A protein has these predicted regions:
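Short, Lys/Arg-rich, polar N-terminal cytosolic tail immediately upstream
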Residues: 1-13
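A structural signal for multi-pass alpha-helical bundles of membrane permease subunits
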Residues: 11, 15-278
């Protein structure tokens, strides 16, 4: 009996060791590229940050912030209306929203390009900002958030007390929607910040370099083979290591998204979204 217990204990310990080793290898697989990126970027000594890098960084910030503002202004009312009202076409509209979520963003670029050209906004910042604000996933998240029994009872009580629909939405729904609004803003900013294809198509002209967002500007610099020598086109480098330059620019692209995540982590990691993902 004792030997059987010892054998079971040894098997359990061996299983734990194997599990930890596999988990460590799995973690290392994802961690090594990030660690390399950070350490390689420290090999770059910047004598001067060029105008293009700062300009592209500010462009990305403006585009992402404006797109997130449009997304919040459209997703919350749309999700609230679909969740709390019965109207003709409600179910088809919800199904259409879900179907649009499944369409790859790249598949919508050509129609958006033709539409922007038709209204004479091609190469304009609006050709990038407005599509950033069209966020069907945010509409669906808002719908899930408001489509709960607790909100239904709360809204019905407010209406019984004499509140009109605008007062219910403005004074009750909006203040209570901060968790889902934070999630929509975070997801929209990540999607906008990392979007390369849409700005690349909209800013097709060579004289629109000053309107590039950061990922597009950096990618074109790298794709054009300007990664050797002292100048990378956006920064003056005192190093002869092109990988260091590339790592620095990639880190400059990733870092703002990480900052947004850190700022939003108390919402994302604290269970405030349990009402969203039911």
């Amino acid at each position: 009996m004792l030997s059987h217990t010892n054998s079971a204990a040894r098997r359990s310990a061996t299983g734990q060791v194997v599990t930890y080793v596999l988990l460590a290898l799995f973690a290392a697989f994802f961690a090594v590229p990030i660690v390399w990126l950070v350490f390689e970027a420290t090999g770059v000594h910047l004598g001067m940050i060029g105008g293009n890098l700062g300009l592209w960084l500010s462009n990305s910030a403006i585009y992402s912030a404006a797109g997130a503002a449009i997304a919040i202004a459209t997703c919350l009312p749309a999700g609230y209306a679909i969740a709390t009202h019965e109207f003709p076409g409600r179910r088809p509209l919800l199904i259409l929203t879900m179907l649009v979520m499944l369409i790859p963003t790249s598949a919508l670029v050509l129609p958006l390009f033709l539409e922007a050209n038709e209204v004479h906004q091609l190469t304009s910042p609006l050709a990038v900002i407005v599509p950033y604000g069209l966020f069907p996933f945010g509409v669906y998240l808002s719908y899930l958030y408001f489509h709960t029994e607790r909100f239904n009872v709360l809204f019905q009580t407010a209406r019984s007390d004499g509140c009109d629909e605008w007062q219910v939405f403005r004074n009750i729904a909006v203040p209570l929607s901060k968790p889902v609004a934070a999630l929509i803003v975070f997801l929209n900013i990540v999607a906008s910040w990392t979007n390369f294809f849409l700005p690349w198509v909209m800013y097709w002209s060579n004289d629109t370099t000053n309107r590039y967002p950061l990922p597009l500007g950096i990618a074109l610099q790298l794709f054009n083979g300007e990664t050797s020598g002292e100048y990378l086109g956006v920064v003056q480098l005192h190093t002869s290591s092109p990988p260091s330059a590339i790592a620095f620019l990639l880190l400059a692209t990733i870092a703002p998204v990480v900052v947004v995540f850190v700022l939003a982590r108390r919402w994302i990691g604290s269970g405030h979204f349990q009402g969203v993902f039911r």
